[in-house]
Amino acid sequence: MLSKEKINRINELSAKAKNGQLTDEEAKERTALRKEYLDTFRATMRDTIENVKVVDAEGNDVTPEKVRQAKKNKFLN
């Protein structure tokens, strides 16, 4: 999870960019922070999806095959 300070900094830089007052150095910092945020988000989402088990009303496991394979590959690596 990204720290509160980094998220606040992303928001500060975005607000500054809306006003057109962003320096080249700040634009690079914003790009790096956004990339870090998206990488963290994607990893968390992937982990969440890989740990989901879908069950129908009758109690049968109907988890999509792609998710099952991802889960299996995760434990093999």
From Swiss-Prot:
<dbReference type="GO" id="GO:0005737">
    <property type="term" value="C:cytoplasm"/>
</dbReference>
<dbReference type="Pfam" id="PF05979">
    <property type="entry name" value="DUF896"/>
</dbReference>
<protein>
    <recommendedName>
        <fullName>UPF0291 protein Bsph_1689</fullName>
    </recommendedName>
</protein>
<dbReference type="InterPro" id="IPR009242">
    <property type="entry name" value="DUF896"/>
</dbReference>
<comment type="similarity">
    <text>Belongs to the UPF0291 family.</text>
</comment>
<keyword id="KW-0963">Cytoplasm</keyword>
